[in-house]
Curated annotation (Swiss-Prot):
It comes from the Bacteria. This is D-alanine--D-alanine ligase. GO terms for molecular function: ATP binding; D-alanine-D-alanine ligase activity; metal ion binding. Binds 2 magnesium or manganese ions per subunit. The gene is ddl. PROSITE patterns: ATP_GRASP (PS50975), DALA_DALA_LIGASE_1 (PS00843), DALA_DALA_LIGASE_2 (PS00844).
Length: 348
C-alpha cells in the first residue's frame, strides 16, 4: 500500500513562528511512517516559501527542521509549488497569516485538503473581538470587556473602561495567540502602556475584566460530529500565563482531567461544542475557560490551531481520552480529506 503524503507548513510571518516550529517538529516525530511520507516547507518571516526536508522514516532525536539559520536561498520556491495531487497539508501555523483564513484560502485555491478549520471560521476565531460577539449570540458566558480600535480617543477609552470594569484588567491584541502581546494592568497608567504595547501587534485591542479563576481547557475534534475531551487544567507557578511562561520558562504544569465537579465538566464540554458549531469550525479546536471562585464559568478563548507540541494541552487531552498522538494526527488527516470532498461537492 502506498503511503499518504503529508505536507507540513511551519514557521510563518507572525510572532508565534517559534511555537510553529516546535509543533511541526513534534508532528514529524510522532507520525506513523508506515502510513505517511512527510514533506516539510518553511515559511519565512518575510513570507518566502522554502522547501526543506522530506522524511520516509522517523527522524533521529538530534535532527531538527530547517529554519532561518539553516535554510539556503536556492531552496526558495513559488508558494504554488507545494501542490501535489493527493497530498494533505497540515498548516502547523499559529497567529496571523497562519490561522486567520489566509493560508486556508490559499490551499483552497490550490484545491488541496488541509487540516483544520475553513476560511470563514478561521477568520472569525482569530479575531478575539469578533469571536466574543459570535459567542454572545450563542448564549455562551464570557467575562466583561471593552474594545479599543486604533485611531479612537485613547483617553475616552480609558475612562469608559474604568466605568465598566475594575482593575486588574487584561489587554490583548485581537489577532494574536499564545499570549503574545498580552499584559495585565492594575492602574490607568499601566492600562495605557498595555494598550500601546498591544497596538504594536494589532490595531484592534480587547480589554477584559480580570477574574480570580482557574484556567480549564477542552479539546474538540471532528467536523459535523464534533467530540470533546474531559477538561484539563493549566496549573501555573506564575501570576500570569504569558508567552514566556508557556514556551520558554516551562513554569506551568497540566492536570488531566481537571479536579472540578461533574456539573462544571458537563457545562464546559457543552459550551465548547456549542462554540465550535457557532463559528462553523471543523477539524480541531481548543476552548479555554475560566472557572471563577464562585463557580461561574466563562469561555475565554477558542483556538482553531492550538499548540501541537508533544507537551501541549491539546494532544495530551486526547491522549487521556485514549487517542495517541500518532492516532490524533491520522484522524485529523482523515477529517481534512472528508471536508475537502464536501467542499468540492458543494462547488459542482
Amino acid at each position: 500500500m502506498s503511503k499518504q503524503t503529508l505536507i507540513l507548513l511551519y514557521g510563518g510571518r507572525s510572532a508565534e513562528r517559534e511555537v510553529s516550529v516546535l509543533s511541526a517538529e513534534s508532528v514529524m516525530r510522532a507520525v506513523d511512517y508506515t502510513k505517511f511520507f512527510v514533506k516539510t516547507y518553511f515559511i519565512s518571516q518575510t513570507g518566502q516559501f522554502i522547501k526543506t526536508q522530506e522524511f520516509s522514516s522517523r527522524p533521529t532525536l538530534t535532527e531538527r527542521l530547517m529554519t532561518n539559520d539553516t535554510i539556503r536561498l536556492e531552496q526558495q520556491i513559488r508558494p504554488s509549488d507545494i501542490y501535489e495531487e493527493g497530498a494533505v497539508v497540515f498548516p502547523v501555523l499559529h497567529g496571523p497569516m497562519g490561522e486567520d483564513g489566509s493560508i486556508q484560502g490559499f490551499l483552497e485555491v490550490l484545491k488541496m485538503p488541509y487540516v483544520g478549520t475553513n476560511i470563514l471560521s478561521s477568520s472569525v476565531a482569530m479575531d478575539k473581538i469578533t469571536t466574543k460577539r459570535v459567542l454572545e449570540s450563542a448564549g455562551i458566558p464570557q467575562v466583561a470587556y471593552t474594545v479599543y480600535i486604533e485611531g479612537q480617543d485613547l483617553d475616552r477609552c480609558l475612562a469608559e473602561t474604568e466605568a465598566v470594569l475594575s482593575y486588574p484588567v487584561f489587554v490583548k491584541p485581537a489577532n494574536m495567540g499564545s499570549s503574545v502581546g498580552i499584559s495585565k494592568a492594575e492602574s490607568e497608567e499601566e492600562l495605557r502602556a498595555a494598550i500601546l504595547l498591544a497596538l504594536t501587534y494589532d490595531s484592534r485591542i480587547l480589554i477584559e475584566q480580570g477574574v480570580l479563576a482557574r484556567e480549564i481547557e477542552v479539546g474538540l475534534l471532528g467536523n459535523t460530529d464534533v467530540k470533546s475531551t474531559l477538561p484539563g487544567e493549566v496549573v501555573k507557578n506564575v501570576d500570569f500565563y504569558d508567552y514566556q511562561a508557556k514556551y520558554i520558562d516551562n513554569e506551568i504544569t497540566m492536570a488531566i482531567p481537571a479536579a472540578i465537579d461533574e456539573s462544571a465538566m458537563t457545562s464546559m464540554r457543552t459550551y465548547a461544542e456549542t462554540a465550535f458549531k457557532a463559528i462553523g469550525a471543523c477539524g480541531l479546536s481548543r476552548c479555554d475557560f475560566f472557572l471563577g471562585q464562585d463557580g461561574q464559568i466563562y469561555l475565554n478563548e477558542l483556538n482553531t490551531m492550538p499548540g501541537f507540541t508533544q507537551w501541549s494541552m491539546y494532544p495530551l487531552l486526547w491522549e487521556h481520552m485514549g487517542l495517541s498522538y500518532a492516532e490524533l494526527i491520522e484522524e485529523l488527516v482523515r477529517l481534512a480529506q472528508e471536508m475537502f470532498e464536501k467542499r468540492e461537492g458543494h462547488l459542482i
